[in-house]
């Protein structure tokens, strides 16, 4: 595929609907790990909530991915594909975010902490985590 000219890019953009979106994390997940781990990914919750988003006029969601999910690439790709299909069924175009250095620096797979009442993003995890970041400093 060749690079688009400026006029081709502008023509494509003019054909797009106005982007109306939000950050999305399903109601059963405390963070981006819990959203996509096989034990906690919930198609029905995603279908219901993305349907609500569509009914409210949203056409895009920003979704954060976590590098630790790639420890089992086939399972992660399967779950992500299921999520993308749910988005498509609801006319939602996701924006997938690969890196996030906010909040808790020591992520791990498995059961995630319970929410802390009154603390914004109490269970959110950095991606990549501090161990990986520090290991790269000495390269």
Summary of predicted features, one role per range:
Residues 1-137:
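Active-site mouth of glycoside hydrolases
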């Amino acid at each position: 595929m060749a690079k688009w000219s400026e006029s081709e890019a502008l023509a494509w953009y003019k054909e797009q609907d106005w982007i109306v979106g939000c950050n999305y994390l399903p109601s059963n997940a405390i963070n981006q790990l819990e959203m996509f781990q096989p034990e906690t990914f919930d198609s029905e919750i995603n279908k219901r909530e993305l349907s609500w988003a569509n009914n409210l006029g949203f056409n895009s969601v920003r979704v954060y991915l976590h590098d630790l999910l790639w420890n089992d690439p086939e399972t992660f790709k399967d779950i992500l594909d299921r999520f993308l299909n749910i988005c498509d069924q609801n006319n939602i175009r996701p924006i997938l975010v690969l890196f996030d250095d906010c909040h808790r620096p020591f992520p791990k797979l498995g059961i995630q902490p319970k929410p802390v009442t009154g603390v914004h993003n109490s269970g959110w995890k950095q991606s990549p985590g501090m161990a990986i970041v520090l290991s790269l400093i000495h390269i």
